[in-house]
Amino acid sequence: NWGMDYSDMRALPNMLMEWLEILNRDYNHPSIVCWCPFNETWDYAGRRQDDDMIRTVYRATKQLDGMRPCIDTSGNFHVQTDIFDVHDYEQNVEVFKERYDLLFKTGELFDKYAHRQPYTGEPVFMSEYGGTTIRAKDNAWGYGQPAEDEAQFLKRYEGLTTALLDN
């Protein structure tokens, strides 16, 4: 959906036609285990995603392939989905660990966007996390406070990854 205005239903006919071609082309490919037509449908130029568009594409996907799960939109904002996909770039290992310990222990998922995409017990899939950078002389990109050196980077990466593996 790169470059697509997913807040405007006028984009749906072309997008859906291309998406259905992809599904037909790749349906029998052995490496396809799940479909995901959208990624990070954040508010676009001050306009919210059109939930009906996301729902329509999800339902068309399920109509064509009812066997595989479908993630309606990876990252945000879920409307109708088989798997609750999460992007979490929290850099504080303890905060990150507490979030997913809570999910494992109580079934509650921390989501700062819960008002827009309520979690209703779907399987959770962490498709993006980390994003840690090492402080560099130039303007390196990453989330949160950069690691001061490789050792700090590796310690943080290990902590974030262990928090997921433990849950």
Task: Name these PLM-found stretches.
Residues N1-N167:
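Substrate-binding/catalytic cleft of secreted carbohydrate-active enzymes
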